[in-house]
Amino acid sequence: MNQNLLVTKRDGSTERINLDKIHRVLDWAAEGLHNVSISQVELRSHIQFYDGIKTSDIHETIIKAAADLISRDAPDYQYLAARLAIFHLRKKAYGQFEPPALYDHVVKMVEMGKYDNHLLEDYTEEEFKQMDTFIDHDRDMTFSYAAVKQLEGKYLVQNRVTGEIYESAQFLYILVAACLFSNYPRETRLQYVKRFYDAVSTFKISLPTPIMSGVRTPTRQFSSCVLIECGDSLDSINATSSAIVKYVSQRAGIGINAGRIRALGSPIRGGEAFHTGCIPFYKHFQTAVKSCSQGGVRGGAATLFYPMWHLEVESLLVLKNNRGVEGNRVRHMDYGVQINKLMYTRLLKGEDITLFSPSDVPGLYDAFFADQEEFERLYTKYEKDDSIRKQRVKAVELFSLMMQERASTGRIYIQNVDHCNTHSPFDPAIAPVRQSNLCLEIALPTKPLNDVNDENGEIALCTLSAFNLGAINNLDELEELAILAVRALDALLDYQDYPIPAAKRGAMGRRTLGIGVINFAYYLAKHGKRYSDGSANNLTHKTFEAIQYYLLKASNELAKEQGACPWFNETTYAKGILPIDTYKKDLDTIANEPLHYDWEALRESIKTHGLRNSTLSALMPSETSSQISNATNGIEPPRGYVSIKASKDGILRQVVPDYEHLHDAYELLWEMPGNDGYLQLVGIMQKFIDQSISANTNYDPSRFPSGKVPMQQLLKDLLTAYKFGVKTLYYQNTRDGAEDAQDDLVPSIQDDGCESGACKI
């Protein structure tokens, strides 16, 4: 290696390359790590040095060299690369490795317009000094490389044009805590700031992208998911599309309920005109969704919902596929098909499903969600009424078309609307759930808007976060984490701005939260349980019982302090009904775990004091924030021991947690013999979760005789999910073999559904 190379320093001066200095930094970064070779990293980076190279380029070359060595056999390179990257990041942000004092940092950032000036109005210099003592900057050293790159790319406050970075991770965590608890009484708030900071900076609570990147800055829109319902009028259709544009521009993921729109050929104004049907309006929504690209990368994302019995359903089911022409396809949204028991019954009995335009059958559309018996009565009545336009299709043909499209696109989702309303925190007679969101984990009431400022409409918002199951040692720890998550997210509802009155009204009235989990696969591996063989059923029952119990308890305590949410009377909780009362009883055949908590005392306390939040739980996908916590994604099994994610900084490799000790305990996705075990677990979770779950189905065609997944199997899994009370099904993944080519480096699916970090966390 040529010792005479000149390097250009950050201040522009030049000096001879100092290989000792590089060696010392590597020595420091490798301390306590196993099976990492400093000389390997040096060798790989030296060949890329050249005369006049900038010191910052040297640093980046070394980081890259370490990152390229991350593998199943040497997972600790992900920490070596991360420490080097943190060193580099702090140099860029502060000009030195040691971070400045918190107060000085905040003053500087407020002056630059990067932080919200209320921070300095709300807290004294003395309080900032106290917060500084809470911070442990060494926690930066616990990040994996993928986490540091995600922080740099998405979360740290920066100038996205020049790439300058202004903060490091511990400041992010403490300031999110400070912002969220700023309205708490002075005598208690710092204690909450400390507790919340400790929980998020040790990865016990995982926060969604909008909160991590936005809280502490002057922009205040952090709801991950937005649900907008459209009425059957031009005014409502236009109001819906302008609401979509407003929220897409703020990085939210959108769920659109377009199920009320009348079918092709319906009369308008008593027959004066002939209706063009759903497809032109779906196109209008697609244009709205794609109108604002986030940083020029891509447009927003939406899932659009309609009922299975809609007269146009056969044309709607194929909207996403690659056949057809531009005129009869709307490919850039995903779709959710809404089903209930009557539809499944017709399938099982080999009968027909009758299709109607919602505009021709008074009361049917509303009853589909609000009252299953009334729906069946009206449906059979309208089937017999010859004066009503209708079309009969064999149930098996309609279900097969739907499942074929789900299999070929992966993005036709399922919503069981009866489960969403019978096992729901809302009273379906007053506040029915008529749609879900982008990623199918939210189930909240909505009302159509007639114009964008309509006070009577309701746009549903949900604010998310998650518990990292891998970071807790016993279920009692969830009590404190539930208190912190509920209080922080509830405070966020008052802290954020609302671009549309109908959204503010719903958020303030219902105060809905969706707290989920990440790292479930690691949690199972740690306990020696598997997805597919039933061994995890009772553990899952115990775990999710604890989660929902402690969340309800935390919200009930908060209600004693700050009052119940204003629309508490629209919930089933107000009647003393709990999730343990309304779950699908078929679950008792697969989980015989008794209840472990005092639900009766909680029931009485909720009846007396109410809840601060109408909903508390939802299980969302968590691709990005799982990387920050070095965790597995949501409730999903990993696809490989090493996952690869492409990012603008190149390829990020991430090894499953504790691989060295647990590699035999993990059950990988494509090792599972089928969907049964997974769907049972989702059903058990859904017994307790008050909203819904982003649950996926997965198929490996090579497991079947002809190398094709039989339709019978797809329908059987759909019915299994329904039987166990599953409310929604999200992606359908099909193994295509290509992704296994790189030995053990199985690339994670590149998914553009929620790239905004919207209703994922």
Curated annotation (Swiss-Prot):
Sequence positions that bind GDP: T209, N437, E441, E623, T624, S625
Q: Which UniProt keywords apply?
A: Acetylation, Allosteric enzyme, ATP-binding, Deoxyribonucleotide synthesis, Disulfide bond, Nucleotide-binding, Oxidoreductase
The record's catalysed reaction(s) read: a 2'-deoxyribonucleoside 5'-diphosphate + [thioredoxin]-disulfide + H2O = a ribonucleoside 5'-diphosphate + [thioredoxin]-dithiol
Reported regulation of activity? Under complex allosteric control mediated by deoxynucleoside triphosphates and ATP binding to separate specificity and activation sites on the alpha subunit. The type of nucleotide bound at the specificity site determines substrate preference. It seems probable that ATP makes the enzyme reduce CDP and UDP, dGTP favors ADP reduction and dTTP favors GDP reduction. Stimulated by ATP and inhibited by dATP binding to the activity site. In vitro, its activity is increased by dithiothreitol (DTT) or thioredoxins (non-specific).
Record keyword Hydrolase present: no
Which InterPro entries does this one have?
Answer: ATP-cone_dom, NrdE_NrdA_C, RNR_lg_C, RNR_lsu_N, RNR_R1-su_N, Rrm1
Which EC main class describes this enzyme? oxidoreductase
UniProt-annotated binding residues for dTTP: D232, S233, L234, R262, R269
Which residues does the UniProt site feature Important for hydrogen atom transfer point to? C225, C462
Q: Which GO terms describe its cellular component?
A: cytosol; ribonucleoside-diphosphate reductase complex
User: What is this protein's function per UniProt?
Assistant: Provides the precursors necessary for DNA synthesis. Catalyzes the biosynthesis of deoxyribonucleotides from the corresponding ribonucleotides. R1 contains the binding sites for both substrates and allosteric effectors and carries out the actual reduction of the ribonucleotide. It also provides redox-active cysteines.
The extra comment attached to this record reads: E.coli produces two separate class I enzymes. This one is the functional enzyme during growth.
The protein's name is Ribonucleoside-diphosphate reductase 1 subunit alpha
Tell me which species this is from: Escherichia coli (strain K12)
